[in-house]
Amino acid sequence: MTSLTHKAQEVFRHDRFATEVTGIRVDEVREDYARCLLTLEAKHCNAMGAIMGGAMFTLADLAFAIASNSRCLIDDRPLEWVSLGSSIQYLGQTKDDTLVAETSCVKQGSSTCVYNIHIHDSKGKAVALVTTTGIHLSN
């Protein structure tokens, strides 16, 4: 585990809804990149027995928060980026017991950023795609 991953785990453990209630784990962090994991349980399912959209969105939201603030973690600065808006496309369901969210940075500017968060199962099957725009808190 890298020191950046460890630092992100320490900082974002305070995102208690994502980490304690939902059970999301921070797996890997690099500059502008985060990978988070969610082991699926019955509590993550909707009335139809499918994965609840909110569980997938929470997974993507935490991955975005970590990736967009990764440079702050590297430089030991306070967190500076928050979500301004997101869209989610549900691409399919999975029978797998693990969801993985991985970020890709589209733009990391001085006042706004855009990230795609790809959610797939542990076998690589695409489950959702989230696009999130963030804003720097100084703006």
What positions do the PLM features span?
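Terminal targeting signals and extreme-terminal segments of soluble enzymes
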Residues: M1-N139
